[in-house]
């Protein structure tokens, strides 16, 4: 199916490129000049590198390197041409490799021991492991330029072509989109299969710990009504609690305690008075994993970030092992803090592999003005148990 779609896509692109430009009617030579300018490729992915520079290694002559370089440039948040360990972990964290493994990979790529890797060095490393994906990425480079030319041609036809010319161009454009979407669906299916397999492997490794956690809880985690509204509270002000009728007695008190805890975290006055709040006789030796993400957003990317954040909060709140998730928008309007309560650290790491988390991570790479600040801490589960004062 993929080969047939690729052949049809290439045939359609060739037909579209071989189609002679329509004769100008109303604007004559001026229209043809504008159409030709629109048909020129824009912002090529291959960077302008002086020919005298031989490049760092064999990657310079390999196909697909331009796409990889373009991807890695997105991870370079401060545009200094290199990635720090924090930027590296933020961009590549997927819940499969832990922090130590990512750090080890970082130092492997950092062959000159400078505690940073430049995008070219990173590209060279991945090129050596591309395999058959070299042809795929090289084709993407060609497709990128071909699509840009086709869009310019389409604009020219619609400005000066006949109804028949417009009909043919419209048909070719839609069919090209269908064929590309068919290829994309095949790739997405492969991605989903790999993610499902990876998630199952990690779940099998973590089964003993989950059994202990369930027995200590004495039952499943109490349900709650998630709050899907993103608000902008004043500084040092806790989040509003979820609305709606609680499903169990004591649920409203749970959410109130969580909101109070978040408020204390935001004002940086959190203290653990275990003698006052907990006692071993009550079986309070179980903990929840609290994950805190602080993000500074670029002003021009704020709208895109907010849309993705709302989707992330909705999806995360529906996960069974996420006890609570909430977000705070700080007074400057561009700083956001997300708090997530997970049953175990392994559940949170498994969440990092989910499609919604990966999608949100890619949006953060494009919209944040600096790498996010991520921290985690164990919180006594008794604070979130019904019937506790």
From Swiss-Prot:
Record's keyword terms, sorted: Calcium, Cell membrane, Cell projection, Coiled coil, Cytoplasm, Membrane, Metal-binding, Methylation, Repeat
Transmembrane found in the keyword field: no
Tissue: Expressed in the iris, in the ciliary margin of the retina and in the inner portion of the neural retina. Expressed in the spinal dorsal horn with especially strong expression in lamina IIi; found in excitory synaptic boutons (at protein level).
Residues the record lists as Asymmetric dimethylarginine modifications: 42
Omega-N-methylarginine: modified positions: 10
Record-level Gene Ontology MF annotations: A2A adenosine receptor binding; calcium ion binding; type 5 metabotropic glutamate receptor binding
Binding sites annotated in the UniProt record for Ca(2+) 2: 110, 112, 114, 116, 121
UniProt cross-references to CDD domains, sorted A to Z: EFh
Location(s), subcellular: Cytoplasm; Cell projection, Dendrite; Cell projection, Axon; Cell membrane
Domain called ABM: residue spans: 289-377
Coiled-coil ranges (or none): 173-198
Chain residues that bind Ca(2+) 1: 76, 78, 80, 82, 87
Induction annotation: Up-regulated by PAX6.
Any single Gene Ontology cellular-component annotation: plasma membrane
Domain EF-hand: residue ranges: 63-98, 99-132
PROSITE patterns with a match to the protein in the record: ABM, EF_HAND_1, EF_HAND_2
GO BP, sorted A to Z: negative regulation of G protein-coupled receptor internalization; positive regulation of adenosine receptor signaling pathway; positive regulation of ERK1 and ERK2 cascade; positive regulation of glutamate receptor signaling pathway; positive regulation of protein localization to membrane
InterPro entries to which the protein is assigned, alphabetical: ABM_dom, Dimeric_a/b-barrel, EF-hand-dom_pair, EF_Hand_1_Ca_BS, EF_hand_dom, NECAB1/2/3
Quaternary structure, from the entry: Interacts (calcium-dependent) with ADORA2A and GRM5.
Biological role stated in the UniProt entry: May act as a signaling scaffold protein that senses intracellular calcium. Can modulate ligand-induced internalization of ADORA2A and coupling efficiency of mGluR5/GRM5; for both receptors may regulate signaling activity such as promoting MAPK1/3 (ERK1/2) activation.
Name of the protein in question: N-terminal EF-hand calcium-binding protein 2
